[in-house]
A protein has these predicted regions:
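Terminal domain-start leader segments
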Residues: 1-209
């Protein structure tokens, strides 16, 4: 099943002139735990751990994960044709170095930029530019392969009771404003969903418990 999905992904890669495709474990907000709609790395690799990045080339594939998941990943990747890259271990290349080593000048690296944080994307770009590789950041190729992909959830938000939150929204905002004033800051921009949910005591059910 995994090998068939990888084969279909490679077909889409060739259609889009992409020689390497990166699939991180993330969503549009870089949430630590993602809903099933964003479980692209799990779908394409069969690896169910919470952390890992899959890279698919036209002739090989590899998955990077940390020490928490070495045994699990080795078991789940068996027979898939995906090599396990044990992060931090001797002789294991960095993801970008692996891509550079296996691609040639003017080849293209693709990924869905909506689920890649800016810091990582810029770091990749600096390495790929030196190797004269192109980047296409507007490709959700997994969506073309995952024909029964779950719908993007949109559950209603609700106010989390102060009884359980331990502090009211008004109190949190007051403390935040006092902190900003103390540090001579006019405003703050929050983009992390969990920070916003905590500050305003908001919750939803997009991600199952």
């Amino acid at each position: 099943m995994i090998t068939q999905r990888i084969s279909k992904l490679r077909e889409k890669m060739m259609e889009n002139n992409v020689q390497a495709y990166i699939i991180p474990t993330s969503d549009f907000h870089e949430t630590e735990y993602v809903c099933e709609y964003f479980a692209c790395r799990k779908y394409m690799s069969g690896f169910t751990g919470s952390a890992g990045v899959l890279v698919v080339l036209l002739d090989k594939a590899a998955l990077w994960t940390d020490g928490r998941y070495f045994i699990q990943a080795a078991n789940q990747l068996e027979g898939t044709g995906i090599d396990l890259m044990r992060m931090g271990q001797p002789g294991v290349p960095e993801l970008d170095a692996y891509i550079v080593e296996n691609l040639k000048e003017n080849d293209t690296v693709g990924f869905d930029g909506r689920v890649m944080n800016t810091k990582d994307a810029l770091a990749y770009k600096s390495v790929f530019d030196l190797a004269h590789l192109n980047m296409n950041v507007n490709l959700d190729l997994v969506n073309d392969v995952w024909t029964d992909r779950p719908e993007l959830p949109s559950t209603p938000t609700f106010h989390y009771s102060e009884k359980f939150a331990g502090e009211s929204m008004e109190s949190k905002l007051s403390r935040l404003r006092a902190f900003l004033k103390e540090n001579k800051v006019d405003s703050i921009v929050l983009t992390s969903v969990d920070q916003i949910a905590w500050l305003y005591n908001l919750r939803a059910h997009d991600i199952p418990n």
